[in-house]
């Protein structure tokens, strides 16, 4: 099932998500739906708060990027960044902020402690694009969007577009929670 995506200014995106205590059939179903939703949008990462679940759960698949064609889809539960290295500036976008992109400075490499879809613990190093995608998605779990990390001057330049999203005046090629909720209210 394709889940509607919550957009900029939705309260769930500003909350610190709750850790998972384990993986049961409901979480397995949510993981599958998150992958379906991410692929349909299309995106390369999706955090549970983006689909209305305040849980520390992320799915990532960067194999659509040529240099990462061999990458295997990844489920990240209860992630915690334990070390950072380097620094890089790159343009980011987000399914929760449709139609907007902006430059964000982030560490270029991270060491991450997390659990997988079987709730097994891992500690691994990630660099380059994967480090960036993981940090972007982990930000969602902490109530932060990439626009919150943009330079203040750049952020001011996109404020009208952000206001339009907050007011529901935005279209996307994937279902938005605000549109779904509006249709349900009218029914």
Curated annotation (Swiss-Prot):
Per its record, the protein catalyses:
N-terminal N-formyl-L-methionyl-[peptide] + H2O = N-terminal L-methionyl-[peptide] + formate
Record EC number: 3.5.1.88
Could you tell me what the cofactor note in this record states? Answer: Binds 1 Fe(2+) ion.
Q: Which Pfam families match?
A: Pep_deformylase
Q: What cofactor(s) does the depicted protein rely on?
A: Fe(2+)
Any keyword Protein biosynthesis?
A: yes
Q: Which residues form the active site?
A: 137
UniProt lists the family membership as follows:
Belongs to the polypeptide deformylase family.
Tell me what this protein is called: Peptide deformylase
What is the species of this protein?
A: Chlorobaculum tepidum (strain ATCC 49652 / DSM 12025 / NBRC 103806 / TLS) (Chlorobium tepidum)
């Amino acid at each position: 099932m394709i889940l509607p995506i919550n957009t900029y200014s939705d309260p769930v995106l500003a909350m610190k998500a709750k850790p998972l205590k384990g993986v049961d059939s409901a979480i397995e179903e949510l993981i599958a739906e998150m992958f379906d939703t991410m692929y349909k949008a299309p995106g390369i990462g999706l955090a549970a708060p983006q689909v209305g679940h305040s849980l520390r759960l992320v799915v990532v698949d960067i194999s659509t990027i040529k240099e990462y064609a061999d990458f295997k889809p990844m489920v990240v539960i209860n992630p915690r960044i334990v070390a950072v290295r380097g620094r890089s500036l790159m343009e980011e976008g987000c399914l929760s902020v449709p139609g907007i992109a902006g430059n964000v400075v982030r560490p270029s490499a991270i060491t991450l402690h997390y659990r997988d879809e079987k709730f097994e613990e891992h500690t691994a190093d990630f660099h380059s694009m994967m480090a960036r995608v993981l940090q972007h998605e982990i930000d969602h779990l902490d109530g932060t969007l990439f626009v919150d990390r943009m330079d203040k001057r750049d952020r001011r330049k996109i404020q009208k577009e952000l206001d339009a999203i907050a007011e529901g005046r935005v279209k996307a090629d994937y279902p938005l929670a605000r549109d779904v909720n509006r249709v349900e209210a009218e029914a």
